[in-house]
Amino acid sequence: MGKLRVTYVKSAIGYARDQKETLAALGLRRLNQSVLKPDNPSVRGMLFKIQHLVKVEEVEDEVQA
């Protein structure tokens, strides 16, 4: 299973409190900050809720030898 790179690209000022709390739960505090999250239904649901505030990219897991 891959990972998702989530980048905070638009300010949450003026949006509902639950959207701001979702950003905080994902570990996003500052604009243009990126975090890596596992690609699972829980994270996908959070991202769906704030899709207008973030950019999401799929990242493949590194191969460990």
Swiss-Prot record:
Gene Ontology terms: cellular component = cytosolic large ribosomal subunit
> What keywords would UniProt list here?
Ribonucleoprotein, Ribosomal protein
SUPFAM superfamilies from the entry? Answer: Ribosomal protein L30p/L7e
InterPro entries xref list: Ribo_uL30_ferredoxin-like_sf, Ribosomal_uL30_bac-type, Ribosomal_uL30_CS, Ribosomal_uL30_ferredoxin-like
Q: Which GO terms describe its biological process?
A: translation
Q: Which Pfam families is this protein grouped with?
A: Ribosomal_L30 (PF00327)
A Gene Ontology molecular function term for this protein is: structural constituent of ribosome
Q: Which family does the UniProt entry place this protein in?
A: Belongs to the universal ribosomal protein uL30 family.
> Which HAMAP family does the record match to this protein?
Ribosomal_uL30_B
Oligomeric form and interacting partners: Part of the 50S ribosomal subunit.
Name of this protein = Large ribosomal subunit protein uL30
Where does this protein come from, organism-wise? Chloroflexus aggregans (strain MD-66 / DSM 9485)
